[in-house]
Amino acid sequence: MKEEKKLLLQEVEEKISASQGFILLRYLGFTAAHSREFRNSLSGVSAEFEVLKKRIFFKAIQSAGFDIDSSDTSGHLGVVFAYDDAVSAAKQVLDFNKQHNDSLVFLAGRIDSANLSGKEVEAVAKLPSMKELRQQIVGLIAAPMSQVVGIMGSALSGVVSCIDQKIQKN
């Protein structure tokens, strides 16, 4: 049994090092169907949900050199490992949570090399994603440009109209 725990610890350490971040959750009233649906929703954002033993998870993050508050870790715990964008994974957890009557509680996390409390992870999940921010920036840049094009177009049509009237008079 000890060898099995060592292998599990090594596997969790590998997942932590391969991920861009992780989110520690407490789950309440999760059925097998909820778990399957949650895992499927996370696969769309390159993340996975694992139910782990507390000791193994905390040993793994300790050996990785991370300091996560373990004071409020009662109940059933699970970890979301985000392999691409940890913020998108946090958003997906928040969306799933809204749809399923707050069956998940954010306990802690690590996003972009920062250790966060559960409330901080939830706050990050509520921020706009990089894609949304890029769209907003493009919109901010495009709006004045389209106004300039409109002004230039109306100025040119005014000049063309004046020339046309001069031609018609002569």
Curated annotation (Swiss-Prot):
Q: InterPro entries recorded for this chain?
A: Ribosomal_uL10, Ribosomal_uL10-like_sf, Ribosomal_uL10_bac, Ribosomal_uL10_bac_type, Ribosomal_uL10_CS_bac
Q: Where are the transmembrane segments?
A: none
Q: Which Pfam families match?
A: Ribosomal_L10
Q: Which Gene3D superfamilies match?
A: 3.30.70.1730, 6.10.250.290
Cellular compartments per GO CC: large ribosomal subunit
Q: Which UniProt keywords apply?
A: Ribonucleoprotein, Ribosomal protein, RNA-binding, rRNA-binding
- What molecular function does GO assign, one term? large ribosomal subunit rRNA binding
Q: Which Gene Ontology biological process is one annotated for this entry?
A: translation
Report if keyword Ribonucleoprotein is assigned: yes
Coiled coil segments of this chain: none
Q: Which PANTHER family match?
A: 39S RIBOSOMAL PROTEIN L10, MITOCHONDRIAL
**So what family is this one in?**
Belongs to the universal ribosomal protein uL10 family.
Cited function: Forms part of the ribosomal stalk, playing a central role in the interaction of the ribosome with GTP-bound translation factors.
The subunit structure is: Part of the ribosomal stalk of the 50S ribosomal subunit. The N-terminus interacts with L11 and the large rRNA to form the base of the stalk. The C-terminus forms an elongated spine to which L12 dimers bind in a sequential fashion forming a multimeric L10(L12)X complex.
Q: What is this protein called?
A: Large ribosomal subunit protein uL10
What is the organism of origin for this protein? Chlamydia felis (strain Fe/C-56) (Chlamydophila felis)
